[in-house]
Amino acid sequence: MGRFIFVSFGLLVVAASLSGTGADCLSGWSSYEGHCYKAFELYKTWEDAESFCMEGVKGGHLVSIESSGEADFVAQLISENMKRLDFFVWIGLRVQGDEKQCNSEWSDGSSVSYENWIESESKTCLGLEQQTKFRKWVNLYCGQRIPFVCEA
């Protein structure tokens, strides 16, 4: 009986220590600073990719890149998890309507506090470009079908 209590307590300690470390991400997803991420090698328009992320996991959206550390994490995630490295990958930022400037929110509703544009780019639907090792943002035609990264 004493051994059972000791083992049960040990398992409880391990479970508590894993809480919030990525253990609560779905299988196949990666954790970074309390969020879960997955690169999808499916070819979808920006809008279809956003819908896919929202329907696939509770609280899911196209990735919102809010720091250089997160940008590096996402770039590494793409490079390590996609068999075919396409030229572009969707992120969760686009301009609504006829505006000429960046929408002030990501698709998940968070504010744009970090920017990493390729110089001279106008701002419509945004993706990451392979030539920059998926670290810089580039504007793209929103109807283009390319891979994407979801965040939850």
Curated annotation (Swiss-Prot):
PROSITE patterns: C_TYPE_LECTIN_1, C_TYPE_LECTIN_2
Keyword Secreted attributed: yes
Alphabetical list of SUPFAM superfamilies matching this protein: C-type lectin-like (SSF56436)
Cellular component aspect of the GO annotation: extracellular region
All residue ranges annotated as the C-type lectin domain in the record: 32-151
InterPro entries: C-type_lectin-like, C-type_lectin-like/link_sf, C-type_lectin/snaclec_domain, C-type_lectin_CS, CTDL_fold
Keyword hit for Metal-binding: yes
Family: Belongs to the snaclec family.
General remark: Calcium is required for ligand binding.
Protein name: Snaclec coagulation factor IX/factor X-binding protein subunit A
The organism of origin for this protein: Trimeresurus stejnegeri (Chinese green tree viper)
Lineage: Eukaryota, Metazoa, Chordata, Craniata, Vertebrata
